[in-house]
């Protein structure tokens, strides 16, 4: 079974990096959409109903925490992974309190041995 993934990040480079990662073929993931911020992403996520949303934490219009809150309220089955350039524990604590499954610091690598 393919897991559907949706990416939300205001920067193009992280979206391209995730999109081009080798994990898609190896782990049975399929990319179903992407958006530059939470405000644009939310209706797209409601339409696509992905299994996993990978989101940045700081974005214009609707940040990753607000997006996570909205997703968990209306689509609680969706797993959320936050990618953040901020190591401030306050962001991680907020994410955990919202039910976010993973909080990873950028840059993220898929290479073995990390």
List the predicted regions and their residue ranges:
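Non-catalytic signal-transmission and effector/linker regions of two-component phosphorelay proteins
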Residues: 1-4
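The short loop immediately C-terminal to the conserved phospho-acceptor aspartate in CheY-like receiver
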Residues: 6, 11, 57-58
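Structural signal for short hydrophobic segments within the conserved structured cores
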Residues: 6, 30-33, 102
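Conserved sequence signature across two-component system core domains
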Residues: 8-9, 35, 53
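Two-component/phosphorelay signaling modules centered on CheY-like receiver
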Residues: 12-33
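Short hydrophobic/Thr-rich beta-strand motif most characteristic of the beta2 strand and flanking loop
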Residues: 26-36, 44, 92
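CheY-like receiver
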Residues: 42-114
